[in-house]
Structure formats: C-alpha cells, structure tokens
Amino acid sequence: MGIIEKMRLDGKKGFVTGAARGIGKCTARAFAEAGADVAIVDLDIEEAKKTAQELQELTGRKVIAIQTDCTNKEQVDAMVKQVVEELGGLNFCHNNAGICINAPAEEMTYEQWLKVININLNGIFLTDIAAGKYMLENGGGSIINTASMSAHIVNVPQPQCAYNASKAGVIQLTKSL
C-alpha cells in the first residue's frame, strides 16, 4: 500500500475556516480529494459557495458552504452543529481563517491590534473548543491550526507585530490542547 492510499480520508467529515480562497481552499480541496466530505467556512459566503460547488464537481464529495464569523462564539457553535447535521459527523477541522494588518508597532492602533488578535487567535480558540468538545464526546478527531514562520522568525523591518504575536499564540494554544 502506497502513501496516498494510507492517507485516504474516506468517510471522514470536517471543516476548514477561511476556506473560500488561498491556503484554506487548497487544504479543503486536498481533504475532498482524499475522500472526505468538507464544509467551506468563511465570512464571504458567495466565494464560499463558489468554492464548495467547484470542489464538489471536482471530487464528487459532499462539500457545503457555511458563513461564519469565527470571532463570534454563537456563530462558531452553530457552525459546528450545522457541520455535524449536514455532513453526518465531525472528524477533523482546519482552523485557517486569519488576517494581517501591516503597520509598525508605533503606528498600529489598538483597534487594529485587537482585530488581528481576535481573528487569528481568539477565533481559533473558539473553533478549537467547539469542535474539540464534539470530537471528545464522539471518539476523537484531529484539529489543525494554521500558524506561521512569523511566530518564530521576525525579519526586520517587518511591520506585523500583531500578526507575529497572534501566530506565536496559535502555536502555544495548539500545544496546550
């Protein structure tokens, strides 16, 4: 049996946040190509629907779109419930939603700082907890959180203090689960 066969996800169900485009879209595609049913979770519901349709046509898997603000606990809880109901379970999640605001620390506003930390770190916490509770009650699962090399290495000058701090937080949060 080759490595591709060993990595099959046939019958698995999961979601990817920030999946309408970019890294999230690529990982959702990889999960679907490996045999999983996937929810495309994003704030931009129109792009999420396009991605879901594209991946469903490409892979033949069940792919749905769910609009969710990952910084809103009620929306995150409702999203996890919807994934379970529409896909028939939850075996994995990939928390990928994130933003970067480029501004030197001395020019960044507190509101900008909070926005980055809220989406990149608090959003992952909320999603990890909601998905993790379901997984623990139902035999386990896998949680993947997108971090960044910027959590470890800061190229000077790099005007991304909130982004770097948020991604370092994601690494420590993930280790603490």
For the regions a language model picked out, list residue spans one by one:
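Canonical Rossmann dinucleotide-binding motif of NAD(H)/NADP(H)-dependent dehydrogenases/reductases
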Residues: 9-38
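Substrate-binding pocket helix/loop in short-chain dehydrogenase/reductase
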Residues: 104-105, 112-117
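Conserved NAD(P)H cofactor-binding loop of Rossmann-fold oxidoreductase domains
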Residues: 96-101
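Residue(s) in the substrate-gating loop at a strand-loop-helix junction
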Residues: 148
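The beta1-alpha1 cofactor-binding region of Rossmann-like NAD(H)/NADP(H)-dependent oxidoreductases
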Residues: 45-46, 67-78, 110
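Active-site helix of classical SDR
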Residues: 128, 166, 174
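Conserved glycine-rich Rossmann-like NAD(P)H-binding loop of the short-chain dehydrogenase/reductase
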Residues: 36-50
